[in-house]
Amino acid sequence: MQINEIEGERQPVLMIVVGRQRVGKTSFLNAVAQFLRAHGAAFQIWDADKMNTTYNMSVFHRDARQPGSDDPEDVKAWLEERFIDLVEHRFDAMLDIGGGDTPLARLVQDVPVVATLEDEGVRVVLVHVIGPELADLDYLERFAEDDLFAPEATLIIMNGGLVLTGRSNDVAFSQVSEHPAVKAAIRAGGVVVRMPRLACMSEVTDRELSFEDAIKGKPGVDGRPVALFDKTRVRQWWERELPEMFELIPSLWLPQMRLGELARPPISTKRARKARKAAKPAGDESTSLGTD
C-alpha cells in the first residue's frame, strides 16, 4: 500500500526534521510541537539529537523519548525499535535527529526506511530546514541524488529567523528558491513554506518557556517573564503568523489537530499545488525563528 494511492486517507505520520547544524531544526520542531498540541494533536516526540545538549526537544517537552546511549549503533537500533513500534501501534511521531553523520543516515544505508514504512501505511514526512545559504541545501541534494530518503511528502522550511535584520526575505531566499534541488523537490510533490521570524525567540527559549506561558507573562527559569513588548511579539507570531504557515502545509502531513479552526479537512490536491508555489518567499511583513 503506497502513500500516493490513498491520498485522502489519514495515516500515522512520522515527521523527521533534517538539516545542517545551526539552521533552526530544533527551534522549528519545538514550535510545531507546541502549536499542534495546543490544537489537540497527540503524538510522540523522539529526541535523538545527542550533539545538542543545551537546547533540545527534551528541555521543552518532558515526555520526549531519548535513546539510553550516545553510541551511534545503539541510537540506530533505538530508532529501528521506534519505527517498529509506530507501525504496530499506529500513532503519530516527530523525530529530531540532529545534524552531521547521524544514526538515521546509517540506517537508511542499510535498509530502505521510507519504502518500508510507506508499505506499512505510514506517511513519512521529511522536513528540510534551510536558511538563505546555498550550502543549506546539502541534505536535500544528497538525499535526492541517492534516492534513499526522498519521500513524496517532502517539506522545505525556509527559516526567516536566519535572515539578517533589514534584509528582504525575497532577496535573501532568491538563490535557494531557484536552485535545481528545490525545483526538483517541488516537481516531485514537495511543498516549500517560510517559517515566520520571531525576533525575541531566544528571550523565550533561554528561559525554557513555552510560547503560551510567555504570552501569559509567566516567569522562566531565571525567575523573570519576557519583556512587555516581547510578549506582544510572541502573541502576534503565535496567533497570526504561525497559523498562516500551517495553512500552507497539507493537513495529512501533520499529526491530526482536533481543536480550533485549524482542525480542517485534508488539503486538496489543487490547493497543495498552490502551496508548493510558496518556494518564492513572502515579503518582509512577517516577523523569526532561532537557530538550533
Sequence positions of predicted segments:
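Walker A (P-loop) phosphate-binding loop of P-loop NTPases
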Residues: 21-22
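Beta-strand-loop-alpha "switch" segments that mediate conformational coupling across diverse proteins
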Residues: 175-236, 240
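Switch II (G3) loop of P-loop NTPases
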Residues: 91-107
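Hydrophobic positions on the alpha1 helix immediately C-terminal to the Walker A/P-loop
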Residues: 28
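Short beta-strand-centered segment that lines the nucleotide-binding/catalytic pocket of NTP-utilizing
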Residues: 40-54
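Conserved lysine of the Walker
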Residues: 25
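Conserved catalytic-core segment of NTP-binding enzymes
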Residues: 103-196, 201-204
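Hydrophobic anchor at the beta1->P-loop junction of P-loop NTPases
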Residues: 17
